[in-house]
A protein has these predicted regions:
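PAPS-dependent sulfotransferase catalytic domain
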Residues: 19-43, 62-166
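Switch/coupling sub-region of P-loop NTPases
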Residues: 50-55, 70
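Generic alpha-helical segment signature
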Residues: 42-50
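A conserved segment at the C-terminal end of the G1
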Residues: 1-8
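Short beta-strand-centered segment that lines the nucleotide-binding/catalytic pocket of NTP-utilizing
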Residues: 8-20
């Protein structure tokens, strides 16, 4: 996607987590949950979160592109917030074979603490099931805003899938 002239592949950004108020997105503490509740229940605070997020993005957008692609893995947790503060956004959900996905996570040695669930197979399986359950909810509620991309289909038909995305 980032090779397209209207898209900037910004990498994995923390901006959504920052404006959500959650702190640690995987294991938020009580204060983080209260902050998040304030963001999603107050129109004024939600608008402030939108402004802060867009301001953070503007510092990246040096090429005046139309779209910025944030591929932070845990953004799936925040799709409800994304739809609230960025209703015009498009979301791409890249589905991958569960075994391939979990094995990749399990075998990777992450430097940050946000992927601790990936070092235990049972915990990883539970996390993956929760992830798919939550994505089912998001897809049901926001089906017109979420493009479900099958990774294997992308590998086998890159040109076709790329055209569908753009």
């Amino acid at each position: 996607l980032s090779s397209h002239s209207n898209i900037d592949g910004a990498g994995e950004l923390n901006y959504l987590t920052e404006v959500s108020g959650l702190g640690n997105i995987i294991t938020p503490d009580q204060k983080g949950l209260e902050n998040f509740e304030n963001v999603i229940s107050s129109k004024k605070i939600a608008l402030k979160a939108r402004r802060e997020y867009l301001k953070s993005l503007s510092s990246l957008n040096t090429n005046n592109v139309k779209y910025i692609c944030d591929k932070m893995p845990h953004n799936f947790v925040l799709i409800g917030l994304i739809r609230l503060i960025l209703p015009e956004s498009k979301i791409i959900y890249c589905k991958r074979d569960p075994i391939d996905n979990c094995f990749s996570l399990y075998s990777h040695k992450f430097t940050e603490l946000s992927h601790q669930y990936s070092y235990d197979q049972k915990t990883l399986a539970q996390y993956y099931k929760l992830h798919t359950s939550l994505m089912d909810v998001w897809i049901k509620n926001y089906k017109n805003s979420i493009f479900v991309l099958d990774n294997e289909e992308l590998v086998n038909n890159q040109e076709k899938i790329s055209k569908q995305l753009i």
